[in-house]
Regions:
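Conserved phosphate/anionic-ligand binding catalytic regions in large, soluble enzymes, centered on
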Residues: 24, 96-111
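Acidic, glycine-enriched catalytic cores built around paired aspartates
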Residues: 58-61, 69-79, 83, 91, ...
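Residue-level marker for buried hydrophobic side chains located in beta-strands
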Residues: 55, 95-96
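Generic structural "secondary-structure junction" signal
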Residues: 24, 28, 105, 116, ...
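Acidic, His- and aromatic-enriched active-site or binding-groove loops in soluble protein domains
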Residues: 14-16, 40-49, 114-132
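Short, solvent-exposed polar/charged micro-motifs at secondary-structure junctions
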Residues: 1-2, 29-31, 104-107, 347-355
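Core mixed alpha/beta domains of very large multi-subunit molecular machines
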Residues: 1-25, 29-46, 51, 57-91
Length: 402
C-alpha cells in the first residue's frame, strides 16, 4: 500500500488513485486486520484516507490453497476483524468482494451472498466483481440487468438495516473444528498424494484449457510447476468439465461427517436454521453436488488413462464424492439433492441430457488430440476447434464453471 502511494507521489500524479489492498490467501486473510491496524495507526495515513477505506477480499487462491469450507470461514473471520478495526479507528470501511461464478470463488445468488456476510460488514455500501461467464446471464438484457441491480441495491440496504445475528460461541467453535479437519483432508489429497497432479493433467482438460481465448490472464503463473503454478480459474474449470467438482466438496463433506458422527448434529441443525452464513455455505455445496456426476468422471478416466495408480486415485475421489452427497443428505434429512429447490433441480434436469453427449465427445477429442501430438511435433491438431467448442458448451450448460 505504502509503496504504491510512494510511486504515485514520485511520478507526480496530481490526482492519485486510491490504493486497495487485497487479502486472498489463507495466511493473508488471517493477518488482514493486523495489517490494516498498522496502517490506521499511522497519523499521516489516517489523514490521507480522510475517514474512508476500501479493502478487497479475494476468494480464488484461498479456496485452491485450503478448500472451500476453510477458505469461506477465513473470509468470514477476516471481514469481522476488519470491520471491528475500522470501527475502532473511526474509518468507514467498504469491502470489495472479488467473487467468481463458482462457489470456490465466492459465487452465490446475490441476495443470499450479501445476507451471509458478518453483521456490520455491509454498512450502506459494497463492491463486487462479476466474472466473465456471469455477466451475460446477469446483465445481457436490459430488463434482467435492471432486475439484478435492484437486487443488489435492496440486499445491500437490508443487510445494512437488518444485519444477520452474531454467531454463537459454540457455532464458531464447531466451524473452527470443521475447517481444521477440512483443510487437513483437502491438503492430504491435493498436496501430499504423489499421483494427484498427474491425475489432474491426464483425466481433466487442464492442459487443453490453455488453448481457450478466455480471461485476461494466462492459465498458469509459470510454464512448468504443480498445483501452485495453476491459476484458480482453470483449476476450478478443469474439474467442472469432467463433472467431479472437486474444489467445492473435497474436505468439506468429511468435516461435516466427522461432526455428525460425534453426535453434534443438533448444533449443525441450529446453525442451518438460524445462521445465514452456514445456510448459504450448505446451499451452495448442495447446488454443486447436484451438478457432479461420478459416472461421467469415470468415463473420462477410463477413456484417457490405463495407469493403475491414477485409477486407484480416481476410485478414491469418486467414493469421497459419494460420501459427501450422503453426508449432506443426512445433514438436511433429505432423500435427494435439491428437494427444497425445485426450480434449480428442474433446470439441471433439463440441461443434463444436452450435456451428456458433449462430455462423451470431449473425452474422445482429448484422446485424439493427445495421440496426434504424441506422434508428431506440432502445436495444433485438426480437432482443436471442436474441442474448444465442447469446453465452451459444457461451461455454458453448467453455468458457474470458473
Amino acid at each position: 500500500v505504502l509503496a504504491v502511494l510512494l510511486l504515485q507521489k514520485e511520478a507526480g500524479i496530481q490526482h492519485p488513485l486510491r490504493v486497495v489492498p487485497l487479502f486472498e490467501t489463507l495466511k493473508d486473510l488471517d493477518g488482514a486486520a493486523t495489517t490494516m491496524n498498522t496502517l490506521f495507526n499511522m497519523h499521516w495515513y489516517k489523514q490521507h484516507i480522510q475517514g474512508k477505506h476500501e479493502v478487497m477480499i479475494g476468494y480464488s487462491d484461498s479456496a485452491k490453497d485450503a478448500g472451500f469450507m476453510s477458505a469461506s470461514w477465513a473470509q468470514y473471520r477476516a471481514q469481522e476483524e476488519l470491520t471491528a478495526i475500522a470501527r475502532k479507528h473511526g474509518v468507514q470501511l467498504t469491502l470489495f468482494h472479488g467473487r467468481g461464478g463458482s462457489i470456490s470463488r465466492g459465487g452465490a445468488p446475490t441476495q443470499q451472498a450479501l445476507f451471509s456476510q458478518p453483521p456490520g460488514s455491509i454498512s450502506g455500501a459494497i463492491r463486487v466483481t462479476e466474472q466473465g461467464e456471469m455477466i451475460r446471464f446477469k446483465f445481457g438484457l436490459e430488463g434482467i440487468a435492471m432486475q439484478n441491480l435492484e437486487i443488489y441495491t435492496a440486499a445491500t440496504l437490508e443487510a445494512t438495516l437488518l444485519p444477520p445475528p452474531e454467531p454463537k460461541a459454540e457455532w464458531r467453535e464447531l466451524m473452527n473444528r470443521m475447517t481444521d479437519h477440512s483443510v487437513k483432508v483437502y491438503r492430504q489429497t491435493v498436496r501430499e498424494n504423489p499421483h494427484f497432479v498427474k491425475y489432474l493433467r491426464t483425466v481433466t482438460p487442464e492442459l487443453e484449457l490453455q488453448m481457450l481465448p478466455l480471461g485476461s490472464r494466462p492459465a498458469k503463473r509459470k510454464v512448468s510447476g504443480g498445483i501452485e503454478s495453476l491459476r484458480a480459474i482453470p483449476w476450478v474449470f478443469a474439474w467442472t468439465q469432467i463433472r467431479l467438482m472437486l474444489p467445492a466438496w473435497l474436505g468439506t463433506g468429511a468435516a461435516i461427517n466427522e461432526v455428525i458422527a460425534d453426535q453434534q448434529k443438533a448444533t449443525l441443525d441450529e446453525m442451518l436454521q438460524q445462521w445465514p452464513y452456514f445456510q448459504t455455505l450448505i446451499d451452495m455445496l448442495e447446488m454443486v453436488l447436484s451438478k457432479a456426476d461420478a459416472n461421467i468422471a469415470l468415463y473420462y478416466e477410463s477413456h484417457l488413462t490405463e495407469d493403475e495408480d491414477l485409477k486407484v486415485l480416481g476410485n478414491q475421489l469418486r467414493q469421497r464424492l459419494k460420501d459427501a452427497v450422503e453426508t449432506l443428505l443426512a445433514l438436511k434429512d433429505e432423500s435427494k439433492l435439491l428437494s427444497d429447490n425445485e426450480v434449480l433441480d428442474q433446470s439441471m434436469q433439463v440441461r443434463k441430457p444436452y450435456l451428456l453427449p458433449l462430455h462423451l465427445l470431449q473425452a474422445e477429442l482429448m484422446k485424439r488430440r493427445r495421440d496426434y501430438l504424441a506422434e508428431r511435433q506440432a502445436e495444433h491438431t485438426p480437432v482443436d476447434h471442436a474441442l474448444m467448442v465442447s469446453i465452451a458448451g459444457i461451461a455454458a450448460g453448467l453455468r458457474n464453471t470458473g
